[in-house]
Regions:
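N-terminal interaction/assembly modules
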Residues: 2-146, 150-177
Length: 177
């Protein structure tokens, strides 16, 4: 092996690995992202879109278009993202009414991130009967932990746990299968 090859070899390997990763991502995007991680990414994008809707009210179609054009959206289940945004945006007031009954803090005084996470979690608890409540709760808490205030995830957990107890009494408290 020539002496100069030892210096070029790591660069060549790194470039080849990056090309392989990019090709796999492109193939997954072309096939349509599905699975648990794709749904989590769709929830994350929905959270960001709901936050943006609170901070900078714009037409829903423009916000959806912006997030679908984002390179990170290749890893997300875009159908689920669109479904979440299309369902949550028009019923924000109804979700706020339910939130007012579940927590002591008025919805208008909630932190915007926790507010959006609670909308997302409440929607999944009320409208996604095929989704176990533990999954909806865990995903919402994870988003609050990742994007929210220091102890915001504890508040989100308490509110959504109370909501799950009321909305899904048959499923709540059952042992894991």
């Amino acid at each position: 092996m020539p002496r100069w090859w030892r210096w070029k070899w790591p660069t060549f390997c790194a470039a080849w690995i990056l090309e392989q990763v990019a090709a796999k991502r492109k193939a997954a995007a072309a096939a349509g992202a599905t699975g648990r991680r794709a749904r989590s990414m769709a929830r994350r994008l929905a959270l960001q879109a709901l936050y943006q809707l609170q901070m900078n009210p714009r037409p829903l179609a423009a916000i959806q278009k912006q997030f679908v054009a984002d390179p990170e959206s290749d890893r997300a289940d875009l159908d689920y993202f669109r479904e979440l945004i299309a369902a949550i945006a028009p019923q924000r007031e109804a979700l706020d009414t339910r939130l007012a009954l579940l927590c002591e803090i008025p919805p208008a005084e909630l932190d915007p991130i926790e507010h959006a996470v609670l909308w997302l979690g409440l929607h999944e608890l009320t409208s996604c009967a095929d989704l176990p409540y533990r999954v909806a709760l865990a995903e919402a808490v994870q988003l609050a932990r990742q994007f929210g205030a220091t102890d915001g995830h504890k508040f989100v957990n308490a509110v959504l746990d109370r909501a799950a107890r009321e909305l899904r009494p048959n499923e709540y408290g059952q042992p894991l299968p």
